[in-house]
Design a protein with these regions (language model features):
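Short, low-complexity Ser/Thr-rich regulatory SLiMs
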Residues: 50-51, 116
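Conserved beta-strand in the GNAT
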Residues: 36, 42-50, 57-58
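Conserved acetyl-CoA-binding loop-helix of GNAT-fold acetyltransferases
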Residues: 69-84, 109
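Short amphipathic alpha-helix that is part of the acyltransferase structural core
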Residues: 1-25
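Conserved active-site alpha-helix within GNAT-family acetyltransferase domains
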Residues: 98-116
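Conserved acetyl-CoA binding element of GNAT-fold acetyltransferases
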Residues: 55-66
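Conserved GNAT acetyl-CoA-binding A-motif
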Residues: 84-97
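C-terminal "cap" of GNAT-fold acetyltransferases
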Residues: 110-111, 117-128
Length: 128
């Protein structure tokens, strides 16, 4: 997967094979949300969850290493994805806060959400 001219295939493979203590296991396996709808059904191998903090909705993407580059379908994702490193864990992150209003609207229609003031600490991690 190429984002902003950089190939993230190796990072993605490391992410998928890494055993991280930082992520709640309920967000893996059959409980993972498929992002196929985000890509109009043309891409397989996405799963995600989001973390809400300080008015920022961070969407963490887990991408199958077998995923073939399909730039047209992931054009929106390419603008949003960044690599976050910390506490020995590396992940791909989408920051909804950094989107234009139009892109936020598109993302919301496809299942993303931003924090509301009613979100509580117990809701820090929510499954999409």
């Amino acid at each position: 997967m190429i984002v902003n001219g950089k190939n993230y295939s190796e990072e993605i493979k490391k992410l998928l094979t890494q055993n991280s203590k930082n992520i709640d296991e309920r967000f893996f396996g059959n409980n993972s949300f498929s992002l196929v709808s985000l890509c109009n059904g043309n891409i397989q191998g996405f799963s995600a969850y989001y973390k809400i903090s300080n008015s920022l909705c961070e969407i963490f993407l887990y991408i199958s290493p077998e995923l073939i580059d399909q730039p047209e379908e992931i054009r929106l994702l390419e603008k949003l994805i960044s690599v976050e490193k910390g506490n020995g864990f590396e992940t791909l992150k989408v920051c909804v806060q950094n989107l234009s209003e139009h892109e936020k609207y598109v993302c919301k229609r496809k299942g993303f959400r931003e924090e509301t003031s009613s979100d509580t600490k117990n809701d820090l991690y929510k499954h999409i």
